[in-house]
């Protein structure tokens, strides 16, 4: 089916199958559509709300066109959020990735520049001295040797440049805001995925099943695309093609409720100071608790099932300052 027919289908309010969506997004990524066509397509998908098939197709096209990452045969994870929750918190998932790796897990973190916050994963890592533009081979070497690497979305998904001007002009959430966490070019074994809106938990979970994720958590924490300590966290656990929905509270992690305000970050430079202090064992207790809760759930994917024990282990590890050594090693690649 030609692009125009697929677009016409969207304009008339009909949804696309996975294969149709893959074909249309292939055309977008390969630069075959005009900006006007891309804008119309994104708005049509937004007004009706993209369904699981359409998101799955978009993910498939993104991965088919991505720069190849030499995938290891050992289990590894990603911890990543959609961004766009508008809360301007410190970089919790970036810190959690470094801490988990320092504790022995393997994490290939996929990330980008800031969407809506002042400081996205690549912004803060660059400020910390990490080269986010390493080659896939160098990133793989870091994953092998120190347990963590960063995959900069713009480097692996260069076809997204065709969409960038349209997204900038539209200034609204589109399907591209929700693709990021699902299109890690390393194709991780495990995923901890944060979403900016509660209604995305189910959509994401169903998409993870369609993408045949081995074991994933999708979380939305009372307005955050992370595990929350200021309220409840809605969770979908995807394992062997099945989805289980449940809620986690701070008590489930053995932690007290704390204000969202205590996690406010700022520009990359400010967030860098917070993360450096945290990884050195000199950070704010609220920051340590938030990172401990998120890292605890990430470690559960690796078979460490006791969340409260995981939190205690993470807090002890943070206090030791060893996580900072992992960050220092990451800056050498």
Curated annotation (Swiss-Prot):
InterPro entries reported in the protein's UniProt record: Anthranilate_Pribosyl_Tfrase, Glycosyl_Trfase_fam3, Glycosyl_Trfase_fam3_N_dom, Glycosyl_Trfase_fam3_N_dom_sf, Nuc_phospho_transferase
Pfam families linked to this entry: Glycos_trans_3N (PF02885), Glycos_transf_3 (PF00591)
Keyword terms, alphabetized: Amino-acid biosynthesis, Aromatic amino acid biosynthesis, Glycosyltransferase, Magnesium, Metal-binding, Transferase, Tryptophan biosynthesis
Binding site for anthranilate 2: 167
Annotated binding of 5-phospho-alpha-D-ribose 1-diphosphate, by residue: 81, 84-85, 89, 91-94, 109-117, 121
Sites where the protein binds Mg(2+) 2: 225-226
Enzyme class: transferase
Residues the entry annotates as binding Mg(2+) 1: 93, 226
EC number: 2.4.2.18
HAMAP family, per the entry: TrpD (MF_00211)
Protein name from the UniProt record: Anthranilate phosphoribosyltransferase
């Amino acid at each position: 089916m030609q692009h125009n027919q697929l677009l016409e289908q969207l304009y008339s309010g009909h949804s696309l199958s996975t294969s149709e969506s893959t074909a249309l997004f292939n055309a977008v990524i390969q630069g075959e559509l005009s900006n006007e066509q891309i804008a119309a397509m994104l708005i049509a998908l937004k007004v009706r709300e993209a369904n699981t098939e359409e998101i799955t197709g978009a993910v498939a096209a993104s991965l088919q066109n991505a720069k190849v990452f030499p995938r290891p045969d050992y289990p590894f994870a990603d911890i990543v959020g959609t961004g766009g929750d508008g809360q301007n918190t410190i970089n919790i998932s970036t810190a959690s990735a470094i801490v988990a790796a320092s504790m022995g897990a393997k994490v290939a973190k996929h990330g980008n520049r800031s969407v809506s916050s002042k400081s996205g994963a690549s912004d803060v890592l660059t400020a910390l001295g990490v080269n986010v533009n390493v080659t896939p081979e160098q990133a793989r070497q870091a994953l092998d040797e120190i347990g963590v690497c960063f995959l900069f979305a713009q480097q692996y998904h260069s076809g997204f440049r065709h969409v960038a001007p349209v997204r900038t002009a539209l200034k609204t959430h589109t399907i591209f805001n929700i693709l990021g966490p699902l299109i890690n070019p390393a194709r991780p074994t495990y995923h901890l995925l944060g979403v900016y809106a509660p209604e995305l938990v189910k959509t994401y979970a169903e998409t993870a099943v369609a993408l045949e994720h081995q074991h994933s958590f999708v979380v939305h924490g009372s307005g955050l695309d992370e595990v929350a300590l200021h309220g409840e966290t809605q969770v979908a656990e995807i394992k062997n093609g099945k989805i289980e929905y449940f809620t986690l509270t701070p008590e489930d992690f053995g932690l007290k409720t704390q204000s969202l305000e205590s996690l406010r970050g700022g520009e990359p430079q400010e967030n860098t100071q917070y993360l450096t202090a945290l990884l050195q064992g000199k950070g704010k207790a609220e920051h340590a608790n938030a990172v401990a809760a998120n890292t605890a759930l990430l470690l559960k994917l690796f078979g460490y099932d006791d969340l409260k024990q995981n939190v205690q282990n993470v807090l002890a590890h943070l206090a030791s300052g060893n996580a900072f050594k992992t960050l220092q090693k990451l800056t050498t690649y």
